[in-house]
């Protein structure tokens, strides 16, 4: 029978989770809508003419930040209290100059993609900010190419940190060779290119997630993708038209349950309606390399995105090396893969993941230090982690650092630990997975 494996406790600084586990995961579940697609559906719907309907939108804090900002810019967006949302677009080029500061909350996607949109709307002044974490995250990676297009952006530390002020301009198209494979950088420039006259091309060193490319095409943008050169070209000015969007389940959220089922003896679960876009399935490939007993069923395409149901059972995992071109395809799953590696036979090495140091927290430091408290043999490297498998974890007092993925990854590690684990600042899970606790209670049996 399902049991209360996790207790939610109010705390002076937020919410604390207390996990006392003895059991296994069993059953079927669905997961919240994909966060990346949810953001883009709201933004493109706001910029399009006509109505956009969104089914399966993630009702997390980050998409709420996006909706809040675009309402202030003139779009009509229904309340995010159900997964069915309507957006009445204001039309590309017709954003209003807001009389408030646009607050992106904790959402790097909201802020970075929105910069490309705001910078390309001439004769308007915008001010954007975020929470303490977001205001410490690097924005220079998107501001630099926007300035090459003619954008006027000012901010702290030589125009690299929020709060930021933007004076919209008529931008010029560019060819930008991005030094990093980042869907946020690519998408920011793509949004800016919608209003520039001519072809804007972005080339990456490796493929990053391609939700923007798929959705730009669906909304009517003139876009050319060349996978051989990892480049995408947007021709502006564009005309966008409202669409009916169906958001699949977020594979980054599914990853927590995939790893939990793989490492907890006796577990056997199905996760239904998971987005399996090939630019996001690095986590599946790595788990298969590690020996996970996993199959994909009912594979289909829904609103232009590959979707499948995933069946996974407990199995003995083996250590591996995670590096190179696969990193952009699983960058958000590195924390939970580190947990999987703890229970594998042999060592696991994670390299080329320095990007994790500038996420909602320094995720390499956060995972290393907190898992060490639980008895893990894990060593932090400049761009990754060295993890010795065969762990025997003990419950401990750990901190999420206010990072949703760190907090949920620690919760999964606690399922295989002896004794009680207390996770502080666990309320951060609501950023991407508001019903994480409910799903765990549903799947857990003892």
Curated annotation (Swiss-Prot):
Cellular compartments annotated: Cytoplasm
CDD domains registered for this protein in UniProt: EPSP_synthase
One Pfam family, short name: EPSP_synthase
Keyword annotations from UniProtKB, A to Z: Amino-acid biosynthesis, Aromatic amino acid biosynthesis, Cytoplasm, Transferase
Amino-acid biosynthesis among keywords: yes
KW RNA-binding (keyword) present: no
Annotated residues for binding of 3-phosphoshikimate: 35-36, 40, 182, 184, 332, 359
GO terms (BP aspect): amino acid biosynthetic process; aromatic amino acid family biosynthetic process; chorismate biosynthetic process
Protein family per UniProt: Belongs to the EPSP synthase family.
Protein known as: 3-phosphoshikimate 1-carboxyvinyltransferase
Organism: Acaryochloris marina (strain MBIC 11017)
Gene for this chain: aroA
